[in-house]
Amino acid sequence: MSYKFPYSVELETKPDFEESMQRVYAWYDNEIIDRVPVRFSAHNAEYNVVDHTNRWNSQKERWFDAEYHVSKYLESVKGKTFLGETFPVFWPNLGPNVYPCMLGGEATFGDVTTWAKHTLHDYEDMGKYRFSPENEYFKKLDEMTDIALEMGKGYFTVGYTDIHHGPDCADSIRGTSELCMDMYDEPEMVKKFIEQCSADFPRVFNYFNDKLQKNHQPSVTWINIPSYESFHIPGTDLAAMLSREQFREFILPCLKEEVKVAKHIVLHMDGKGVARHLDDFLEIPEINGIQWVQGVGDDEPILQWIPLIQKIQAAGKGVVVDLKVSELDAFMDAVSPRGIYLCISTDDTEEQKTILKRLLQWK
């Protein structure tokens, strides 16, 4: 099995880029070449690092310092070699609420993330939440992308930002409690607002994806799974608050449209609340795989979720799974490798090499 790619990516930090992409593309097709893909980084690892540099007048000013963030990432990858399917990717990041902000929403900036301000108090005002290419967040992401494309040559690839549109965007602007109550009191207005929060998503996605493609950059974002064509990771976090019936009424129609935007689709399924809708996810043919985020505390260890993982495998979908190093052997004994894409948190190069050898034996 061998895939032909439209262009080559030459990086001194990732000399085996094409070999790794062969494994990724086999995974998209629910196949295995020699071993399962493995990324040596945990989900949300970037949000555990606080930047103590203090040269800005506000948190927003720090987040908007495009050259600083690209330079910082460049320095972090120089001299390193990325093993497995760990790809050096800089993706422009203005926080998880950047898409609502592109529509005219507002956010509070913190050290490692942002929080949406719930600014919609009356649906009569929802018309003001519209995308504009003159929006400061969109323009800053564009600037950050251009700087990264120039500075990253030979060191890293460039991705696109985290995009939460549709229901999650409406949730950010309206507020979770209010939106959920509105589903009972004003269901048609909720549907109309969700539709409005989805309308410009293809335009924004295609703008950045086209820019990456023109610069021979794979399509990739925060989850670090690239595609030579187009990749998107839908998220449906609001679904954790909804019944199966509400999900099908308010979220599923939007999701079925969202997955049409890209060739390769991996659904972000965050926690058991969202997982109650798994049967609906598995019926969507465009979804290649599901990223399962089991959570912490009582939701650990991963072995309690083996039946859920096997259900996804049985449906012919891939599964992206976060593992601790200590869980690897038991996990390998419990499930088939077919469809598995591992994320393992370890910075130890020798440990990474040992894991890669171990995975070659997983049949």
Residue ranges of model-derived segments:
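Active-site loop segments of alpha/beta catalytic cores
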Residues: M1-A45, V50-Q59, V70, S76, ...
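Residues forming anionic-ligand binding surfaces in small-molecule and nucleic-acid pockets
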Residues: H118-M126
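Short, compact, well-ordered microdomains
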Residues: P96-Y99
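Short acidic, low-complexity segments enriched in Ser/Thr/Gly/Pro
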Residues: T113-K117
